[in-house]
Amino acid sequence: DADRLAIVDEKGEPLGEEYTIVIAADGYLDELQQSEKFVINLSSSLALEKLAEQKNSTVLRSAVGEINVVKKMNEINSNIGGEGNGGVILRECHLGRDSLVAVTLILNRMSQSTDKLSEIYSSLPQFKIVKDKVNVDNINSEEIIKKATSLFENAEKNTIDGVKFTWDDRWVHLRKSNTEPIMRIYAEAP
């Protein structure tokens, strides 16, 4: 349904779906020339937060799902948001993920300099993310989350959607799927 965008650079290298919103935001902030509030979900990359810090902007997190991102955008009157799945939401167009909006924002960023897409990407904060899932058909996923919470006592915890453990430059997010008998596990670090 053309709501997400995956990017490939001029060398044929995929940049990763997590960086669609980051590159779009980079150009958006440079064009705007003022601070902005972004909304992304809990499972999205830290790269946007680190970029926002560099550009005097903020990032707020929502539960996973387009509807949750949009609700948070409305709550804080944010103009731009998205998810680390290639989805970008721009209020001035409409409050839904849209790959054509993402394409426009990416092309806007590319037009702001003579840098190649690979150079734009490499200038951004770099993180590696792992996304996995575990079958929990006969396992109490709440018990898994409870046990994990006791293991990571030194981390900041967010429980709006499963549990996310965050340190300065890394995080782990555990959440039960709403559609399958699985637990999704996401982790990111430099």
Which sequence ranges carry the predicted segments?
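Short, acidic/small-residue loops that bind anionic groups at enzyme active sites
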Residues: P14-S35, A63-G65
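Phosphate-binding and adjacent anionic-ligand microenvironments
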Residues: E31-P190
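Short Gly/Thr/Asp-enriched flexible loops that form oxyanion-binding sites at enzyme active sites
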Residues: R4-I21, L48-E49
